[in-house]
From Swiss-Prot:
Residues 26-46 are annotated as: Disordered. This is Protein hedgehog. A lipid is attached at C83 (N-palmitoyl cysteine). Residues 1-26 form the signal peptide. It comes from Drosophila simulans (Fruit fly).
Length: 395
């Protein structure tokens, strides 16, 4: 038995190399070589080895190309910061929280400024109409001292309750086994002087259940993080916190009408806003002041149960306009012959504002073109405090 027959893979490998390097041979190769290559190429073993060699060469080139791309591509990108996960997604990144020092307040402003908790709105008594706006707090993670025995320390504004519940959760995370202690909330016995937000249910004095005064500086910091509008490390015995009024939060963000206000339908019928439905066509106004009928496609802010403060504007003709303080009203300036927009609570006497003429047809059959629903409206409200001048904002 010869060598070629005893080692078949050696013969196949040599022929494969010959086939791959065929272009390097001269055209004057012998017929015996051609016949040998032809005969071996017909063999299945030869075809398999040729395919393997070609595949290995392709894989080698592909590996080199991928390695080159992995080196070059990172150089073509610039670093960028992305938004983090929202609330409830993933774990919160640990932050270094620094405790407040004695007599420190955040923000470092008067409590009654608009940038803090805002001005006083009046004492709330049990027989006051606003008393029903106070809500009890039955959070089991909060201890209420309730020295009076009347449950008054559990009563507070909705915003104060919301922030207090957040703070209670933070206290349990910061000091396991320790709970938040509320020593004073709504006060009906006038123990806090003539001017105090305790009388409106917008302020609380707090401590920890173990009465450890070394924790109070960090407790004040946790109150700031919980969202209280004004926090003061007022005493070694407790922390004082207060919030904006519920009415100022809602009425200064959106402009609304009362549910009893009416809208003129295309059919000529006047319908209360509280009874409007999606699809009703109501009289509105275009940018150039022309009256048109527009279809109701969405209610951006509709709450028929919410109690709200409103402003009433009376004209010499007997018309009455009832809107929230932050509602924009079309005001006519005779001197400059210009139409501007002013917040309702900033309109003064002898001001001309735009009303519909009862004799006009309101635009006939003309229909307004819908431009779609602006889903980003709430985002614009949130960034307005950072991008708009102070004179443009309703604070």
């Amino acid at each position: 038995m010869d060598n070629h027959s005893s080692v078949p893979w050696a013969s196949a490998a040599s022929v494969t190399c010959l086939s791959l390097d065929a272009k390097c041979h001269s055209s004057s190769s012998s017929c015996s070589s051609k016949s040998t290559a032809s005969s071996i190429s017909a063999s299945p073993e030869t075809q398999t080895m040729r395919h393997i060699a070609h595949t290995q060469r392709c894989l080698s080139r592909l590996t080199s190309l991928v390695a080159l791309l992995l080196i070059v591509l990172p150089m073509m990108f610039s670093p960028a910061h992305s938004c983090g996960p929202g609330r409830g997604l993933g774990r919160h990144r640990a932050r270094n929280l620094y405790p407040l020092v004695l007599k420190q307040t955040i923000p470092n402003l008067s409590e009654y400024t608009n940038s803090a908790s805002g001005p006083l709105e009046g004492v709330i008594r049990r027989d006051s109409p606003k008393f029903k706006d106070l809500v009890p707090n039955y959070n089991r993670d909060i201890l209420f001292r309730d020295e009076e025995g009347t449950g008054a320390d559990r009563l507070m504004s909705k915003r104060c309750k919301e922030k207090l519940n957040v703070l209670a959760y933070s206290v349990m995370n910061e000091w396991p086994g320790i709970r938040l202690l509320v020593t004073e909330s709504w006060d009906e016995d006038y123990h806090h002087g003539q001017e105090s937000l305790h009388y409106e249910g917008r302020a609380v004095t707090i401590a920890t259940s173990d009465r450890d005064q070394s924790k109070y500086g960090m407790l004040a910091r946790l109150a700031v993080e919980a969202g209280f509008d004004w926090v003061s490390y007022v005493s070694r015995r407790h922390i004082y916190c207060s919030v904006k009024s519920d009415s100022s939060i809602s009425s200064h963000v959106h402009g609304c009408f009362t549910p009893e206000s009416t809208a003129l339908l295309e059919s000529g019928v006047r319908k209360p806003l509280g009874e409007l439905s999606i699809g009703d066509r109501v009289l509105s106004m275009t940018a150039n002041g022309q009256g048109v009928y527009s279809e109701v496609i969405l209610f951006m802010d509709r709450n028929l149960e919410q109690m709200q403060n409103f402003v009433q504007l009376h004209t010499d003709g007997g018309a009455v306009l009832t809107v929230t303080p932050a509602h924009l009203v079309s005001v006519w300036q005779p001197e400059s012959q210009k139409l501007t927009f002013v917040f309702a609570d900033r309109i003064e006497e002898s001001t001309f504002f735009l009303l519909r003429d009862g004799q006009s047809g309101g635009g006939g059959e003309k229909q307004v073109q819908q431009n779609g629903i602006h889903w980003y409206a709430n985002a614009l409200y949130k960034v307005k405090d950072y991008v708009l001048p102070q004179s443009w904002r309703h604070d």
